Curated annotation (Swiss-Prot):
Family designation: Belongs to the MAP70 family.
Note: Plant silencing MAP70.5 show reduced inflorescence stem length and diameter, and inhibition of cell expansion. Over-expression of MAP70.5 causes epidermal cells to swell, stunted growth and induces right-handed organ twisting.
Basic and acidic residues: compositionally biased ranges: 60-80
Name of the protein this chain belongs to: Microtubule-associated protein 70-5
Quaternary structure and interacting proteins, as annotated: Interacts with MAP70.1 and itself.
Lineage, top ranks: Eukaryota, Viridiplantae, Streptophyta, Embryophyta, Tracheophyta
PANTHER family noted in UniProt: MICROTUBULE-ASSOCIATED PROTEIN 70-2 (PTHR31246), MICROTUBULE-ASSOCIATED PROTEIN 70-5 (PTHR31246:SF5)
Species of provenance: Arabidopsis thaliana (Mouse-ear cress)
Positions of the UniProt region annotated as Disordered: 1-20, 60-81, 347-367, 393-413
Biological-process GO terms, alphabetical: cell wall organization; cytoskeleton organization; plant-type cell wall biogenesis; xylem and phloem pattern formation
GO CC terms of this entry: cytoplasm; microtubule
Induction remark: Induced upon xylem tracheary elements differentiation.
Region of interest: Required for targeting to microtubules: 190-400
Keywords (A to Z) from UniProt: Cell wall biogenesis/degradation, Coiled coil, Cytoplasm, Cytoskeleton, Microtubule
Gene: MAP70.5
């Protein structure tokens, strides 16, 4: 079989050729690696040599600096010697002048014998000064050459340090990239773990939401039953009060009828005075005033409870609005948020069973509970209205306290999980709307209560005015009766005085006067 007939042979040959090419590439890569290693070694050697050269140059620089310092000291010494020589020259000239003056005075000593040694000393000092100046110039040239060599060494050292810094920066950058890769891998693992925990917690929360819905429905039915019983008790109490008032009115009317019947066959002077009737009416009026005062106190307490409830509802509404605004501050991408809300809704709607409900069923239960909370209660009479309003205020405050606690717990759970689903958002929005409606209804009831309080105050004022009128009328009637009695007594005494015909009638009678 030839290579054309057998495809395996061609494949193996192509694979062998590819293997050879890969081996060549591997050898080339190894050669490059070796070249890079040799370059690195050469660079290290060059760095070492440069460091040695720099160290040697620094030593030479130190030595030259020491030499320069020594030369400076020598130069200072020479300058001092020069100054001393100049001072000696001046002293010699002064001595020459003196000698010259003395020679003029006394020609005993020759002038050349004194000047010759001084001139020889001056020449020697001048020669030393010129030699020192030449040494100084040579030292300056040497220092300049040393400084140029030192600058060149500093430039070479700086370039070597820059290369070393570049290499170190590349190595540090590589190490930082490796560390960031490890951190990203750890974060990825941690996020996967948190995602699994969030899914499990969402399932638990959905189950707890269903249980809370059932508990809320059961609590609503129990609260409605208690409210019905309280309303029935208040109705019975109001019926009892109305019957008592009717009985008192019947008694008053019966006493009036009996008084009228008793006074029909009597004279004007012998008629029974309506004091008992007045006292009875006064007692009844005082009783009604006391009842009105009690109703006023009850209405004030109810208004106070309504205001407290209104403040609590406002505070709760504010907290719910802040809670609804709060989740927007979380750092959650929109895609992950939609995925989480879709998972929650899918979990709530896909699973079967009697314990799981849809969002529409939950909205129906919540609206039914809100409707049960906002049911109007029948009122019978003014007192029934007051007491029923008190009962409803107490019931609503208790129920709203429970709702507020439950909502705070739910809000805390939702915020602690760092997510808010569309399901819970709809539910919270429904409850916010219900609370706003409840606040509006409560404001209406408070206004109605205020109007009723004003009407009751007007009635109390009217009753007080009527009582004052009745007291004034009774006082006027009592004064009129006293006047009539006094006039009757005077008439009787005048009649007796006229009928008396005895002589003692002449005696002045004080009654007749």
């Amino acid at each position: 079989m030839t290579a054309a007939e057998n495809p395996f042979v061609s494949d193996t040959s192509s694979l062998q050729s590819q293997l050879k090419e890969k081996e060549k590439e591997l050898l080339a890569a190894k050669a490059e690696v070796e070249a890079l290693r040799t370059n690195e070694e050469l660079k290290d050697r060059v760095f070492k040599e440069l460091r040695e050269n720099v160290r040697k140059l620094e030593e030479k620089l130190g030595a030259t600096e020491n030499q320069v310092d020594q030369k400076e000291l020598e130069r200072k010494k020479l300058e001092e010697e020069k100054e001393d020589a100049l001072a000696a020259q001046d002293a010699a000239e002064e001595a020459l002048r003196r000698v010259y003056t003395h020679q003029q005075d006394d020609d005993s000593l020759p002038l050349e014998s004194i000047i010759a040694p001084l001139e020889s000393q001056i020449k020697i000092h001048k020669h030393e000064i010129s030699a020192l100046q030449e040494d100084k110039k040579a030292l300056e040239r040497l220092t300049k050459s040393k400084e140029s060599a030192l600058l060149e060494a500093e430039r070479i050292l700086r370039s070597a340090l820059e290369r070393a810094l570049i290499v170190e920066e590349v190595q540090n950058h590589n190490f930082e990239l490796r560390r960031q890769i490890e951190i990203c891998q750890d974060e990825n693992k941690f996020l996967e773990k948190i995602n699994r925990q969030k899914v499990l917690e969402i399932e638990k929360l959905s189950q707890s939401i269903v249980e809370l819905e059932e508990a809320i429905l059961a609590g609503g039915t129990a609260a409605n039953a208690v409210r019905d019983y309280r309303r029935q008790i208040s109705q019975l109490n109001d019926e009892k009060r109305t019957l008592e008032r009717e009985l008192a009115r019947v008694k008053v009317s019966a006493s009036r009828v009996a008084l009228a019947v008793a006074n029909e066959w009597k004279d004007e002077n012998d008629r029974v005075m309506p004091v008992k009737q007045w006292l009875e009416e006064r007692r009844i009026l005082h009783g009604e005033m006391q009842k009105l005062k009690d109703k006023l106190a009850v209405s004030e307490r109810t208004a106070k409870a309504e205001s407290q409830l209104k403040e609590r509802l406002k505070l709760r509404l504010k907290t719910i609005e802040d809670g609804l605004k709060g989740p927007n501050t979380f750092f959650v991408s929109p895609t992950t948020k939609t995925e989480k809300s879709g998972k929650i809704l899918g979990f709530l709607t896909s699973g079967g069973g009697s314990k799981k409900r849809s969002s529409s069923q939950l909205r129906g239960s919540v609206t039914g509970r809100i409707h049960a909370m906002n049911q109007p209660i029948d009122r019978v009479g003014e007192s029934d209205e007051m007491e029923n309003s008190k009962i409803t205020a107490n019931g609503l405050t208790d129920q709203h306290e429970e709702d507020s606690e439950r909502k705070t717990e739910e809000d805390g759970n939702v915020y602690s999980e760092d997510m808010v689903s569309g399901f819970l958002y709809d539910r919270l929005q429904k409850e916010v709307i219900a609370l706003r409606k409840l606040c509006e209804s409560k404001e209406g009831t408070i206004n109605a209560k205020n109007e009723e309080i004003k009407m009751l105050l007007k009635k109390v004022d009217a009753l007080t005015k009527a009582i004052e009128v009745e007291t004034k009328k009774a006082k006027r009637e009592a004064a009129a009766r006293e006047k009539e009695n006094a006039l009757a007594m005077l008439n009787e005494e005048s009649k007796l005085c006229r009928k008396a015909k005895l002589p003692r009638s002449r005696i002045p009678n004080p009654r007749c006067q």
